[in-house]
Amino acid sequence: MYAIIETGGKQFRVKSGDIVKIEKLNIEPGQEVIFDKVLLFKGNEGLKIGNPYIEGVKVKAEVIDEKKDKKVLVYSPPSKKAIHKLKGHRQWYTKIKIKEIVGG
């Protein structure tokens, strides 16, 4: 049994027990979060596809941690002058553990 959820403008295929890195949520570690934007659900009865979301199916997860990801370097080469620009960016993410998929 698995589901495809949407959060933070991205889609993730999850099943019970998975650990997933998603965009930052403003929720403390240890708290429960419920995702109701389920795009697809595959269970024992078959496949359900939402239009755009499936009503009655929710994914329960627990927030494990909130950290910064690895640094991404952005380099701007010089145009006509010898001015180099090198910048770094570290994106915040939230690590969650999927508890169960309810409904379906």
UniProtKB/Swiss-Prot annotation:
Look up the domain of life of the source: Bacteria
A Pfam family cross-referenced in the UniProt record is Ribosomal_L21p
Q: Name one GO biological process term.
A: translation
Keywords annotated in UniProt:
Ribonucleoprotein, Ribosomal protein, RNA-binding, rRNA-binding
Q: Which GO terms describe its cellular component?
A: cytoplasm; ribonucleoprotein complex; ribosome
GO molecular function annotations of the record: rRNA binding; structural constituent of ribosome
**Statement: the UniProt record of this protein carries the keyword Ribosomal protein:** yes
How it assembles, according to the record, is: Part of the 50S ribosomal subunit. Contacts protein L20.
The UniProt similarity line reads: Belongs to the bacterial ribosomal protein bL21 family.
Cited function: This protein binds to 23S rRNA in the presence of protein L20.
What's the protein here called? Answer: Large ribosomal subunit protein bL21
Instruction: Specify the species.
Output: Thermodesulfovibrio yellowstonii (strain ATCC 51303 / DSM 11347 / YP87)
**Gene from which the chain derives:** rplU
